[in-house]
Amino acid sequence: MRLAGVTLAAVLGLAGTAARADDLTGQQRFLCSASHATICYADGECDSGPAWSWDVPQFIEVDLENKRLSTTKASGESRTTPILNLQRESGHIVLQGYENKRAFSFLIDEKTGWVTVAIARKDVAVSVFGACTPKTSAP
């Protein structure tokens, strides 16, 4: 299996276990976790499996008010990525950004909390499926 050095923008390659999604209607802060990721290379080779296979954070904190994605304090990683484009429309939350030569896009179903993430960098594409739940405690 080829590893891609997927950064926080690859973000949601989070937990290897199934997560439970929740209603995010009106929420500004939530926690996301992923259950499955697929990474494909320009040569046509693809790898697929649990998100933890790529050694990425187990959880990602999403802060819409401050437009940022962060690892949790418990991860010990202290990584933050800015959200450059944020839209809430037709029951969806769309987050997009670009950092370290990687572009990312999240599509979150606001009612169910289910999330699909796409990450792209030169010759590599990653897709991640997961779930988000409201975050009620302070950062």
Model-derived segments and their meaning:
Residues 37, 66-72, 115-117:
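Short polybasic amphipathic segments
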Residues 106-107, 116-127:
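Short, exposed beta-strand-loop hairpins at the edges of beta-sheets
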Residues 26-27, 31-66:
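Short, solvent-exposed loop/hinge segments that bridge or flank secondary-structure elements
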Residues 123-139:
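C-terminal partner/receptor-binding element of secreted or periplasmic proteins
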Residues 64-102:
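Contiguous, well-ordered beta-strand patches that form the walls/edges
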Residues 5-15:
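Bacterial N-terminal signal peptides
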Residues 58-60, 103-108, 130-134:
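Hydrophobic/aromatic beta-strand elements that line small-molecule binding cavities or substrate pockets
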